[in-house]
C-alpha cells in the first residue's frame, strides 16, 4: 500500500473489515513491539512521523486487527512474552525489565494482580524505553503502554472484579450449561478431561465448577451453543 494511506482504508476498504460483523476494537501495528491503536486513531496516515506521534510505529509493516472478543491484557502479555524471549540479555533494563513486566502481566491475567501493579508497569515501561541499549528494548513496552492508556478499565476488571470482560483469560472464566439450550447429547461430558460434566442422555447436563479445569473443551464440543463462559 502507498505510504500515507490511513489505517481505516487498509483495514476496512482493502482488508474488508472485521469478520462476521464483529465490532472493531484495536489494531496493533509495527510487529511485536508496536503499539495498539483504537477506533479514534484509524484516520491517522501510515507514515513514520504520524504513527510515532500516537505511540506506534511502522516497524515490520504488519497489522494485527482485533475485535470485541479480544482481551487487551492478554494481548499485552502475549507480545511481552515474545519480546522477553527475544531479548539478547546484554543490557539489564531489557533483560530484567521485560521479565518483571511479563511476571506482572501473567499475575494479572491469572486474577492475582493488584492496582499497584499498573503503576509498576508504567514505571518499568518508562525505565526500559529510556535506558535500554537497542531498538527492541526501547520499544518493548509499547504494547503494554498503549493498552494501559486505552483499555485501563480492562486491566482494572481483571484485578478488582476478577473477571475478563472478553472471556478470554482462562483462570477468570467460569463455564456453565444453559438447560434451555442443552439437548442432552453428552458431547461436552465425553470431551471433558476432568470428568466435571454429568447428566443423563436427552436431559440437561451440568458442570461441577469445583472439578472444572477451565480448559474450554466443553465450549468447543457443544453443537447447540448451550455452554457459555462468564
Feature map (PLM): residue ranges:
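Iron-sulfur cluster-binding cysteine motifs and their immediate structural context
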Residues: 93-99, 177, 187-206, 217-230
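Non-ligating segments of multi-cofactor redox enzymes
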Residues: 29, 170-171, 180, 185-190, ...
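Short cysteine clusters
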Residues: 4, 88-94, 134, 164, ...
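Redox cofactor-anchoring modules in respiratory/redox and cofactor-processing assemblies
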Residues: 1-174
Amino acid at each position: 500500500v502507498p505510504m500515507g494511506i490511513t489505517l481505516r482504508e487498509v483495514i476496512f476498504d482493502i482488508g474488508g473489515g472485521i469478520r462476521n460483523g464483529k465490532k472493531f476494537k484495536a489494531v496493533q501495528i509495527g510487529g511485536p513491539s508496536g503499539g495498539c491503536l483504537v477506533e479514534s486513531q484509524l484516520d491517522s496516515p501510515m507514515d513514520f512521523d504520524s504513527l510515532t506521534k500516537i505511540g506506534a510505529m511502522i516497524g515490520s509493516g504488519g497489522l494485527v486487527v482485533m475485535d470485541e472478543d479480544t482481551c487487551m491484557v492478554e494481548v499485552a502479555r502475549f507480545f511481552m512474552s515474545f519480546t522477553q524471549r527475544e531479548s539478547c540479555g546484554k543490557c539489564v533494563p531489557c533483560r530484567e525489565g521485560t521479565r518483571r513486566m511479563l511476571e506482572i502481566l501473567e499475575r494479572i491475567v491469572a486474577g492475582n494482580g493488584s492496582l499497584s501493579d499498573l503503576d509498576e508497569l508504567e514505571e518499568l515501561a518508562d525505565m526500559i524505553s529510556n535506558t535500554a541499549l537497542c531498538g527492541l528494548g526501547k520499544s518493548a513496552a509499547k504494547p503494554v503502554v498503549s493498552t494501559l492508556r486505552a483499555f485501563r478499565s480492562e486491566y482494572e476488571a481483571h484485578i478488582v472484579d476478577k473477571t475478563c470482560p472478553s472471556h478470554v483469560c482462562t483462570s477468570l472464566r467460569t463455564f456453565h450449561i444453559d438447560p434451555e439450550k442443552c439437548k442432552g447429547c453428552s458431547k461436552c461430558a465425553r470431551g471433558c478431561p476432568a470428568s466435571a460434566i454429568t447428566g443423563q442422555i436427552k436431559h440437561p447436563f451440568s458442570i461441577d465448577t469445583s472439578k472444572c479445569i477451565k480448559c474450554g473443551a466443553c465450549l468447543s464440543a457443544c453443537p447447540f451453543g448451550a455452554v457459555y463462559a462468564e
